[in-house]
């Protein structure tokens, strides 16, 4: 079996080929393939009907993408959404893209996680295990072994194995209150920058915890926030964490020393979301900061964004200096995502909109999707770019910036890194309207 496909994906491919051959009257070829696959594929007339158009649909989506001439570094989402994914019974709280495949995970107040095929707009499975609201999800983990992590109001973090039907392989207890945010920490290692065994969680118990996903042990607790920590983001090289919450004071943590490197003062209300700028944004943010030249791309955690219930987005440098305040949303700002191309910042809010801010034009709001959802928009994620020369499992992906530009442990940045990534022009949003929307080329 191909290492690029899970058992489920391989089975669906086989069914699609059999159904396609039958639909174009190549009955002998269809029968021969069924005979060769034997009991590994169970297919009846109803299954044939279901899968007969799937192969063509996949193929035309590939052709459509190949025909796109637009520069992906300038692509911005526009209405209408390509897909509206419905199935959750309560508000959607979080979404996350698989780093390689066309899978999207969404979490909800209904205690479930749903796995969707975002290309087809179809539900793949529902994952159950949490007993209260799922507050965040994230894909990552050791090289060659992508996992899905989830956290919940039930005080736990759970790890799920996508290659084994999303089996719950580990539960991480330890927090004393709701776990609000969870992110895999990149290793920064050459050739596999986004892989790593560490996971960070943020909680209403006012702490950040670092976990080893291979053992399930909490290896470090970061204390310093004086109220609920709602959001956390790791730097691309895994050296720093940027976190914020109800105390209104974001903190930049040095993971090696477990100490606060910088604090950021300015917000007037609870901070709902944080983001670390990719290296591709450095030239534009350096201009806004008044710097004569941008920081080297080998440096991580140079610029940051925060979104707050005070309805503003603020941009900062690593010393805690406020660069710019972005005003435009009419309600709580709930999620942020830097464009992998570096020129834009995207935001969603309880005003039901998606806003696109141009970092090259003094952070002017250049697009508003006013009908993004029918209720508060709670979450936003950008599909991580793919590294073109990744390994067989494709596990050398990045999360928002050219991975090879990150420097860790003396590894020199690759000057050709920008040519090695493929930006996926896809975002997902979730809402209190219980829907997930996919905006894509």
From Swiss-Prot:
Reported function: Positively regulates the activity of the minus-end directed microtubule motor protein dynein. May enhance dynein-mediated microtubule sliding by targeting dynein to the microtubule plus end. Required for nuclear migration during vegetative growth as well as development. Required for retrograde early endosome (EE) transport from the hyphal tip. Required for localization of dynein to the mitotic spindle poles. Recruits additional proteins to the dynein complex at SPBs.
Subcellular location: Cytoplasm, Cytoskeleton; Cytoplasm, Cytoskeleton, Spindle pole
SMART domains the UniProt entry points to: WD40
Composition bias type Low complexity, residue spans: 398-410
UniProt keyword annotations, A-Z: Cell cycle, Cell division, Coiled coil, Cytoplasm, Cytoskeleton, Microtubule, Mitosis, Repeat, Transport, WD repeat
GO cellular component terms attached to this protein's record: cytoplasm; microtubule; microtubule associated complex; spindle pole
GO biological process: cell division; establishment of mitotic spindle orientation; microtubule sliding
Recorded GO MF terms: dynein complex binding
Species annotation: Neosartorya fischeri (strain ATCC 1020 / DSM 3700 / CBS 544.65 / FGSC A1164 / JCM 1740 / NRRL 181 / WB 181)
Domain named LisH: residues: 9-41
Name of this protein: Nuclear distribution protein nudF
SUBUNIT field: Self-associates. Interacts with nudE and dynein.
Region (Disordered): 390-415
